[in-house]
Amino acid sequence: MSRRYDSRTTIFSPEGRLYQVEYAMEAIGNAGSAIGISSKDGVVLVGEKKVTSKLLQTSTSSEKMYKIDDHVACAVAGIMSDANILINTARVQAQRYTFSYQEPMPVEQLVQSLCDTKQGYTQYGGLPPFGVSFLFAGWDKNFGFQLFMSDPSGNYAGWKAAAIGANNQAAQSMLKQDYKDDITREEAVQLALKVLSKTMDSTSLTSEKLELAEVFLSNGKVKYQACSPEKLNSMLVKSGLTQPSAEES
């Protein structure tokens, strides 16, 4: 039945479904997991890296975490070439807003603008939708710390804690069970690592397979900080999710 209606993004099935958009969401389900948790003093993003190699230049490459502006960052799951286009679009929009109004772009306004672009690609004939989902973490003076999730359809929503990528439903269920409204940033890191350790396909959790980033306030200014492999390893040991190396012990 679907073959009659999935050749173009502009054709609805009799059930009102856009199959090309659903196929894009299937691609995200095969990508590495990413988890975002909003706390009272920051937002934490943790992602599972699928590409791991000793030859990879980790200092210049990132698979899951990207800084958009000084006050906004994102985690991605899906087709990375699609993600790069949208991330660059978001960066340009944020800089244009800052240039025009001399203040940072509100987080939700930036997310909505990018999602308008994503939604447009579900209406153009001959163009596939973007096969990528995002978790946006940010802070602005109006609403403080915020976490948004968007999917290939262009839909977005604000969340206290959210998961995208492989096994996202299991991760979402665990977050719903363990999340507290008064959670701190340190507790959010521990929770995100715990959830990811139980939903990843890999049997062992190491810094080579993870990326972690935080958005928080430091001396009254918003700061984006990507966690180094060494610090991430110490966090995993502290959480009891991995054994200390011979050098550390």
UniProtKB/Swiss-Prot annotation:
UniProt xrefs under SMART domains: Proteasome_A_N
One GO term describing the cellular component: proteasome core complex, alpha-subunit complex
Heme in keyword set: no
One GO term of the biological process aspect: ubiquitin-dependent protein catabolic process
InterPro entries, per the entry: Ntn_hydrolases_N (IPR029055), Proteasome_alpha (IPR050115), Proteasome_alpha-type (IPR023332), Proteasome_asu_N (IPR000426), Proteasome_sua/b (IPR001353)
TM region positions: none
Tree of life domain: Eukaryota
Keywords: Cytoplasm, Nucleus, Proteasome
Subunit structure comment from the entry: The 26S proteasome consists of a 20S proteasome core and two 19S regulatory subunits. The 20S proteasome core is composed of 28 subunits that are arranged in four stacked rings, resulting in a barrel-shaped structure. The two end rings are each formed by seven alpha subunits, and the two central rings are each formed by seven beta subunits. The catalytic chamber with the active sites is on the inside of the barrel.
Function according to Swiss-Prot or TrEMBL: The proteasome is a multicatalytic proteinase complex which is characterized by its ability to cleave peptides with Arg, Phe, Tyr, Leu, and Glu adjacent to the leaving group at neutral or slightly basic pH. The proteasome has an ATP-dependent proteolytic activity.
Family: Belongs to the peptidase T1A family.
UniProt-recorded name of the protein: Proteasome subunit alpha type-4
